[in-house]
Regions:
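Aromatic/acidic polysaccharide-binding cleft in carbohydrate-active enzymes
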Residues: 12-91, 103-107
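Carbohydrate-binding surface patches
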Residues: 94, 105-124
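Substrate-binding/catalytic groove segments of enzymes
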Residues: 97-103
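Generic recognition of flexible, low-complexity loop/linker segments
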Residues: 1, 34-37, 112-116
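Loop/turn elements at helix/coil->beta-strand transitions in domains of secreted/extracellular proteins
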Residues: 5-10, 42-47, 98, 121-124
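Membrane-embedded translocation segments of transport machinery
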Residues: 1-8, 18
């Protein structure tokens, strides 16, 4: 898309983990990280989760495609569970500041995913 329309801003939207809430699963955060890194390395300027907060069933939802979210609320108790995907998103948000520009980054291992950006203040 970037090659065809380099003047357009690309956003990844509606990221989520399907099939329930996945409480305690590190796989969800790892999946988010791989997706965010791959998208940033391919001209995406932003990454947006579909739902930041859902209830303990992965809803509410009108079509029964229940999902996980970075924050899960137990409605009866009012308890909020912070899933690892919340912390993964927070990690990227902390280091990739508004106005940052992605810079070339490479690894020598196929199982190591990486991205890098130059922030407006000069930090990497």
């Amino acid at each position: 898309v970037h090659d065809a329309w380099p003047d357009k801003h690309l956003l990844f939207t509606e990221g989520c983990q399907e099939c329930g809430t996945h409480l305690g699963s590190w796989a969800v955060g790892e999946r988010y990280a791989r997706s965010i890194i791959a998208d940033l390395n391919n001209w995406t300027e932003g990454w947006i989760d579909w739902n930041l907060l859902l209830d303990e069933t992965g809803g509410p939802n009108h079509v029964s495609n229940f999902c996980s979210a970075p924050l899960i609320v137990e409605t009866a108790r009012g308890a909020v569970h912070t899933l690892n995907s919340w912390h993964y998103i927070g990690h990227f948000s902390r280091f990739l500041r508004p106005g940052s520009r992605r810079v070339l980054c490479a690894t020598t291992r196929d199982d190591l995913h990486a991205t890098a950006a130059l922030n407006p203040d000069g930090s990497l």
